[in-house]
Amino acid sequence: MSDNKEDSTVDNSNSTEEVPLPTRFEVELEFVQSLANIPYVTYLLTQQQLLWKDPKFKNYLKYLEYWCEPPYAQCIVYPNALFILKLLNGFMEKATVNEDGLLDGLEDLPKVIQLQGNQWMNEMVERWAN
């Protein structure tokens, strides 16, 4: 038999259609939900760029608390993300801006997340099971 069948798949590599960028809603939802991933939060808090010590990041986390309110909270698949968001904001509220423009008073935050994160994840699973 010859292999003269037409390929039923469409080649979209030359397509001029662009994939739409995610909306702000989608980006913020994805970021908030990523906070339920303790290793990711630990990474954020230990990266070299010290993003988490930037007052702009503090303001962004505070802004994201609207996800804790209806109707936004019902979009959250991992409710523990909201717990972590509130925890981070609690630490951030106590921070002050130093002469370098970075937040001071957050030195213990990475340690707390690393030491307690697994326990929080287990508690979250137990809450879901009940």
Swiss-Prot record:
The Gene Ontology terms for molecular function here are:
transcription coactivator activity
List, alphabetically, the Gene3D superfamilies matched: Mediator of RNA polymerase II, submodule Med31 (Soh1)
Q: Which UniProt keywords apply?
A: Activator, Nucleus, Transcription, Transcription regulation
Q: Name one GO cellular component term.
A: core mediator complex
Q: Which InterPro entries match?
A: Med31_sf, Mediator_Med31
Pfam families from the xrefs?
A: Med31 (PF05669)
The processes (GO biological process) annotated in the record are: DNA repair; meiotic gene conversion; positive regulation of transcription elongation by RNA polymerase II; positive regulation of transcription initiation by RNA polymerase II; RNA polymerase II preinitiation complex assembly
Compartments where located: Nucleus
Explain the purpose of this protein.
Answer: Component of the Mediator complex, a coactivator involved in the regulated transcription of nearly all RNA polymerase II-dependent genes. Mediator functions as a bridge to convey information from gene-specific regulatory proteins to the basal RNA polymerase II transcription machinery. Mediator is recruited to promoters by direct interactions with regulatory proteins and serves as a scaffold for the assembly of a functional preinitiation complex with RNA polymerase II and the general transcription factors.
Family statement: Belongs to the Mediator complex subunit 31 family.
Outline the subunit composition. Component of the Mediator complex.
Q: What is this protein called?
A: Mediator of RNA polymerase II transcription subunit 31
Q: Which organism is it from?
A: Candida glabrata (strain ATCC 2001 / BCRC 20586 / JCM 3761 / NBRC 0622 / NRRL Y-65 / CBS 138) (Yeast)
